Amino acid sequence: MNKDELKKVQLAIHDLIQKEQYDVAMPLINEVLTEYPDDAATLNFAGYIWLMGDKPAFAYQYFRRALQEQPGNKALWTSLGRACHELDRFDEAIKYFLKSAELDPSYAMAYSNASASLVQMSRWEDAEKAAKMALECDPKELHAQLNLAHSYLAKGQWVEGWKEWDKSLGGKFRKELVYGDEVRWNGDKDKTIVIYGEQGLGDEIFYASCIPDAIAISKKVYIDCDERLEGLFKRSFPEAIVHGTRKQDNVRWLDGITFDARCGIGGLPQFFRTHSKSFPGTAFLKADPQRRLMWRALFDSWNKTVIGITTKGGTFRTNAKGRSLTKDDIAPLLKLKDTILVSLDYDVEERIDGVCYFPWATDSKDYDDTAALIAELDMVVGVNTTALHCSAALGVKTWCLVPKWHQWRYAQPSMPWYRHMRLIYQDDRTWKEVIENLNF
């Protein structure tokens, strides 16, 4: 393979990566590296594919090797920083992003990525500064806008935060659904609107506190939610028409229906949660009374305090490491007198002795099963998960163990969204130290 052929192959690899055809691109990359093992561009391609495949440790090695060949390449320093970011090595990531900015002070991606790492470290003021520097370089840099939103929202600057948050709709983390020729809802009254879920299950529950506000000012409200929430939302919002089809194609109920406007559920707060006093914090979900009776009968037969517990949450991108409790961590709970612990975790691989498990409820495809269980507990304690959102939304006493690095929604001294949720911060302590100091 001569140099001209190499350039042609690299163009083909680049085109395949743009089309996200990584499995086709990788054999070509291997072929190039066999003949040109020091080619920085091809090493970068390989690193990018590993990064997109959620294998940041492999990506890190390729980017580092590429930088040995091209130490003045600003994009490579940013890529190395991104790999460190995905590995939760945020201080190292920021160092590499700043190196990239040093090479080119007008490079928006360097500041934008730095702001993302600062957000993950809950350093809101610094994240805001970095995001604004990125936007000075490129006012349309979407990730910087999202990081700026997180910073504002963490500090309770609701109007500014929701304005930036709204710009992220349609991006990687907030999928936008379009049903016809309807417009995005601007909060106008007396309209027929469709509210759709756009993130995870916990996010749908979290933002659902705004649904009653939307119903109150609209002519008619349709809700297109996750199928697991359909029954729970139908009961909780009887004035709305609810369908659990947001992840489906060719949806029949849409035939013959015209909407005036659509709104992602995460877009509702910009209309209804604009200042501290606009958060009612009241319970807004209603569990199935018949399924509740089953759990009530069981728990009454125990004649003990029944506490729900969550010991794991999130993914490697959402601080799963910080949102994890071991048997040793929860040992103080296991020693509580006249108390039974019930797991609210799902897809449990290793059970903890002394904890009760009901997978037919927690792993159910119908979240009504989980909600009914939660509704009859005396309280819930654990790391932040969908179950904790559900618990607080049902009005159950909920203690949320907030890791040192946490999302913007847990940055307030108290949780404005749920008056039934108490935030307990880890700070620099171990989880066992935190739990040992809880007074039940």
Where are the language model's segments positioned?
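Alpha-helical solenoid repeat scaffolds of the TPR/TPR-like class and their adjacent stem/linker regions
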Residues: M1-M379, N384-F440
